[in-house]
């Protein structure tokens, strides 16, 4: 029930992102390889995780480029099993280790990276808001140095420049399922794919 709040909103809710992704992968032999705190733990709340390799995401290194690198490493390990590797990739995290996209392309590591593109270092946004409130300074300037806007980043184009199929940016919730389906088909064919989804903060 809670997952349906803002279901048709744009930017896309993190609950819808996770629900739509699970609908596409649930009948596959899948492995989620990214942390889930950034998406309010929706995968744990909505997905059936029954095998130990289905969630190998949280390593405690959030916000320092952990997710992208760990996910590509896990995808390399999963490749020999023919397992569909999926990462819900935070945008600020990816920017710290952007070269990992080239690594995935160069070594032909099949992975579906679904961008949680909330256009900011959202973990820091919330921290700055808490600190500003604590010191009674207001939060109207919390975006300075913590958001990624003016211009917005097109991660699909960055992926293409690194040799990976880039899909998006997806801003309309109705376009999400077809984009994920296309991406999964390509990954199952052995390609790394990035689907850029413009999302709400959490």
Briefly describe each language-model feature range.
Residues 42-201:
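Thiamine diphosphate
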Residues 1-77:
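Active-site diphosphate/adenylate-binding microenvironment
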